[in-house]
Amino acid sequence: MKKLFLLLLFACTLVGLPHTLSAQTETRPYWETSPEFASEDKDLVLNVLDSLALIKLPHRIYGELELLAVEKDLLSLKTSSSGQWSLRLLPLPNGTPLLALIRTVNTPIGDSALQFYTPSWEEVKDSNAVFTAPQASDFIPTSMSATDRARLEQLLYPLYLVYKWAPQGRLEVSVSTPTLLSDATREADRKLIEAIPHKKYQWKGGHFVLLNQ
């Protein structure tokens, strides 16, 4: 009798999980109102969000559309063979969320754009008050010699940045280096490229704060 009761309890819990997980995904209403996607694509993703307890991520939805990650404040999708779309909700002091969207193209070289929006998907024009993108000079270690610094400046032009969301409201920024490494015929250049640091930022008080210089 006890075993039967436990089985029934487990079944009831499993039935309730999709709705619970979906309800906890606070990105849902902003996905529904996103101006970027067709209503058919939105509905397909919403159906998957309603079935999170029954699937494993990453989950292919159809064609090249794939659900990569979903958390309370995060929704990440693969939108094409080389494209990704990742939305994070950032809390503001007034209690409303700031929509932070990373769009990334992975080929022929990784390249990301980070844009900020109001809850009604109006782009925040003065985004520098929220986040200032690093420049090439920010990725050159100060301990390098003048010769190495000058050479790395050449290698970092043009500069391609890749943005990724990290846990606990963090943002990681790295230089897209695979192409640089494949083109680096000199071992000295390879060592310079491999010394390029990642930048880490923490969301705090309505803007991103650099954690590592």
Outline where the language-model segments fall.
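Terminal domain-start segments
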Residues: 22-92
